[in-house]
């Protein structure tokens, strides 16, 4: 059967369950088929209880204690007893083995610790500590926390609030030995026993002490070797009894001697120093407070806590975080200024003998010595602080998610719109569409020949282009041919009186006037309706305007010799072309109006889409912030 100790309170729900409280011990516990439940006996009542509310008590040392007396009663140990009796003699009080078992039980006592600092429990399973209490240590549960019993109550307590008493059990055994010695060897001992409280004589023989050890029951303990151990322990008792007298007589002299011992050891070992790189203010009494650039004498790097060193600064010893200082050599400790580099060393650096002398003669109190020994058992230590970063961390995706919901990312600049091609004026009107197009991110559609409306069949585009190029050349360069260039070769010849040339000019039209009329008629008719800007625009459809110029010039030369019927037909053809051109202009204006309306509608749609996109971006950024907050909340919970 196994025993369990209760760690948490539990109230019974059913009749077959036990009501348990913290610290109670349940006997004769056995496991049940039902998972998570045990059955045991408490206060004469047997019942069930949950296994996660209790903890098993390990009893590995008890069977060994029970077997020890059996092993010691073997014949081999009796032979060693005979050897001792032959050497030291038989004690008058006889041998009584009963006190021996009590002494062994005391020897197998669990280790104890003494409370150095008061502690108030933060949880139900912790012990309340008062300075001076003695706790029986059961086990080390985790780093920094032990389990033990105090005033018959089991619980946890911090290990750095107590000091382990290693010699407590030996002292109790020594006291038990002295009591048993008085009861066994006091009345019949042939020599006075030094354990009665009287001071031993300077030349006293230690024979009675050895006999006392045998009479106490040590004859069953592994031969004569243990006997010598008992002798040394009795001598240590005498030294302990003499130690208070020495302390009273010498006083502070012993303190100076104790102070000089670590200094002598320090001379053998190389001294270590470290320079502070960040200021630090101590939060506890055993911590050092320093500024940046100070030199600390490093005493030890092992303080029982990771991240903390022990050192001395301005005559005060204490601990400090190791990431606030950098270890340096002994040569560099004389140059605490970090701004200037150290000058080249001309020789070995002088040793700080005066400082060492001051350290040797520095008086220390008993309380200071206790504080030194208890540096590792300080109440609490803050975690070593992290060195602040020298430069700000670059923005990450997580940082972008934490932006405020109202902040928007800067927009990328839009691509500049290329300048539209120059547009021509129609009937002297300035086109306002080009100015609107510049403000819109749309490019002006080009009027390709394929997109133009279908012309009537009577309109000849090539003839119109040739004619326009001819008129442009006449207007721009004043290339109107004179009448002399248009006369026939025989016009200046002498004529016969009273006769004219046969049927040449068709009814009395003078040769000098007819060419001019033929030139003026088309010019006057066309110049009233067609402007040079239209000719420039129409000329853009021609692939080779330079080649059509000579042909137009030849047409002008030949038109001077056309008959009136031909001129009339040509004028009618020109009128038909004018009407078709007017239709084309109307269609183009209508198309431009339609395109302008489409652009306006398209711009409105784009603006609406932009607004909706901005709203979606804002909603998404808010959603990402909410998701980040939820993730943090889940991680923290």
UniProtKB/Swiss-Prot annotation:
- Coiled-coil features, chain-numbered ranges: 580-635
Q: Where is this motif: SH3-binding?
A: 336-352, 378-397, 410-422
Please explain the role this protein plays, according to its UniProt record. Seems to act as an adapter protein between membrane proteins and the actin cytoskeleton. In collaboration with CBLC, modulates the rate of RET turnover and may act as regulatory checkpoint that limits the potency of GDNF on neuronal survival. Controls CBLC function, converting it from an inhibitor to a promoter of RET degradation. May play a role in receptor clustering and cytoskeletal polarity in the junction between T-cell and antigen-presenting cell. May anchor the podocyte slit diaphragm to the actin cytoskeleton in renal glomerolus. Also required for cytokinesis.
Reported modifications of this chain: Phosphorylated on tyrosine residues; probably by c-Abl, Fyn and c-Src.
Covalent cross-link Glycyl lysine isopeptide (Lys-Gly) (interchain with G-Cter in SUMO2), where: 58, 523
What compartments host this protein? Answer: Cytoplasm, Cytoskeleton; Cell projection, Ruffle; Cell junction
The SH3 domain extends over: 1-59, 108-167, 269-330
Protein's UniProt keywords contain Cytoplasm: yes
Which superkingdom does the taxonomy of this entry point to?
Eukaryota
- From start to end residue, where is composition biased (Pro residues)? 341-353, 385-395
GO MF terms here are:
actin binding; actin filament binding; beta-catenin binding; cadherin binding; clathrin binding; identical protein binding; phosphatidylinositol 3-kinase regulatory subunit binding; protein-containing complex binding
Keyword Calcium found: no
| GO CC term, one of those recorded | cell-cell junction
**Subunit-structure text:** Homodimer. Interacts with F-actin, PKD2, NPHS1 and NPHS2. Interacts with WTIP. Interacts with DDN; interaction is direct. Interacts (via SH3 2 domain) with CBL (via phosphorylated C-terminus). Interacts with BCAR1/p130Cas (via SH3 domain). Interacts with MVB12A and ARHGAP17. Interacts with ANLN, CD2 and CBLB. Interacts with PDCD6IP and TSG101. Interacts with RIN3. Interacts directly with RET (inactive) and CBLC; upon RET activation by GDNF suggested to dissociate from RET as CBLC:CD2AP complex. Interacts with CGNL1 and SH3BP1; probably part of a complex at cell junctions.
Task: Supply the name of the protein.
Answer: CD2-associated protein
InterPro entries in the record: CD2AP_SH3_1 (IPR035775), CD2AP_SH3_3 (IPR035777), CD2AP_SH_2 (IPR035776), Endophilin_SH3RF (IPR050384), SH3-like_dom_sf (IPR036028), SH3_domain (IPR001452)
A single GO BP term for this record reads: podocyte differentiation
User: Which PANTHER family does the record match to this protein?
Assistant: CIN85 AND CD2AP RELATED, ISOFORM J, SH3 DOMAIN-CONTAINING
Name positions with the PTM Phosphoserine.
80, 86, 224, 458, 469, 510, 514, 580
Q: Where is this region: Disordered?
A: 167-211, 333-455, 488-556
The record's annotation in Pfam families points to: SH3_1, SH3_9
Its gene is: Cd2ap
């Amino acid at each position: 059967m196994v025993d369990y100790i209760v760690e948490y309170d539990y109230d019974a729900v059913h009749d077959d369950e036990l009501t348990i409280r913290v610290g109670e011990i349940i006997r004769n516990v056995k496991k049940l088929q039902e998972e998570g439940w045990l059955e045991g006996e408490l206060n004469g009542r047997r019942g069930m209880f949950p296994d996660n509310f209790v903890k098993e008590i390990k009893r590995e040392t008890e069977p060994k204690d029970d077997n020890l007396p059996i092993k010691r009663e073997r014949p081999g140990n009796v032979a060693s007893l005979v050897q001792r009796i032959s050497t030291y003699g038989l004690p008058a009080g006889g041998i009584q083995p009963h006190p021996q078992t009590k002494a062994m039980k005391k020897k197998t006592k669990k280790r104890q610790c003494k409370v150095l600092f008061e502690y108030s429990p933060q949880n139900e399973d912790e012990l309340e500590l008062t300075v001076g209490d003695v706790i029986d240590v059961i086990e080390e549960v985790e780093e920094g926390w032990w389990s033990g019993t105090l005033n018959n109550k089991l619980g946890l307590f911090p290990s750095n609030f107590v000091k382990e008493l290693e010699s407590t059990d030996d002292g109790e055994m020594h006291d038990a030995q002295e009591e048993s010695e008085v009861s066994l060897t006091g009345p019949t001992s042939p020599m006075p026993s030094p354990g009665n409280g009287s001071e031993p004589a300077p030349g006293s023989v230690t024979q009675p002490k050895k006999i006392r050890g045998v009479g106490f029951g040590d004859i069953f303990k592994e031969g004569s070797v243990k006997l010598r151990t008992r002798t040394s322990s009795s001598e240590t008792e005498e030294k302990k009894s003499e130690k208070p007298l020495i302390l009273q007589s010498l006083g502070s002299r012993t303190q100076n001697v104790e102070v000089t011992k670590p200094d002598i050891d320090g001379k053998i070992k190389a001294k270590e120093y470290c320079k502070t790189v960040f200021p630090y203010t101590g939060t506890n009494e055993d911590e050092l407070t320093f500024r940046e650039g100070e030199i600390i004498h490093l005493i030890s790097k092992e303080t029982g806590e990771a991240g903390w060193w022990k050192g001395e600064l301005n005559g005060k010893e204490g601990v400090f975080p190791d990431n606030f200082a950098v270890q340096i050599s002994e040569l560099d400790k004389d140059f605490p200024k970090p701004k200037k580099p150290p000058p080249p060393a001309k020789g070995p650096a002088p040793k700080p003998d005066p400082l060492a002398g001051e350290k040797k003669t520095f008086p220390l109190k008993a309380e200071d010595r206790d504080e030194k020994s208890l540096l590792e058992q300080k109440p609490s230590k803050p975690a070593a602080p992290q060195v602040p970063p020298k430069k700000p961390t670059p923005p990450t995706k997580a940082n972008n998610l934490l932006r405020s919901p109202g902040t928007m990312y800067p927009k990328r600049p839009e691509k500049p719109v290329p300048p539209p091609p120059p547009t021509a004026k129609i009937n002297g009107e300035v086109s306002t569409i080009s100015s609107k197009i510049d403000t819109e991110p749309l490019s002006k559609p080009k009027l390709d020949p394929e997109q133009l409306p279908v012309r009537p069949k009577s309109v000849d585009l090539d003839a119109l282009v040739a004619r326009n190029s001819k008129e442009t050349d006449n207007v721009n360069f004043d290339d109107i041919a004179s009448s002399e260039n248009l006369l026939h070769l025989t016009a200046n010849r002498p004529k016969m009186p009273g006769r004219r040339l046969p049927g040449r000019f068709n009814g009395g039209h003078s040769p000098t006037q007819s060419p001019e009329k033929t030139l003026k008629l088309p010019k006057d008719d066309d110049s009233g309706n067609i402007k040079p800007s239209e000719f420039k625009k129409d000329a853009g459809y021609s692939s080779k305007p330079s080649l059509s110029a000579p042909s137009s010039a030849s047409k002008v030369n030949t038109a001077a010799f056309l008959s009136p019927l031909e001129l009339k037909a040509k004028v009618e053809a020109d009128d038909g072309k004018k009407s078709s051109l007017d239709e084309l202009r109307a269609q183009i204006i209508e198309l431009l109006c339609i395109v302008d309306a489409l652009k306006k509608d398209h711009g409105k749609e784009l603006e609406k889409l932009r607004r909706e996109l901005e709203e979606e971006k804002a909603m998404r950024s808010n959603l990402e912030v909410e998701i980040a907050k939820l993730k943090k909340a889940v991680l923290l919970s």
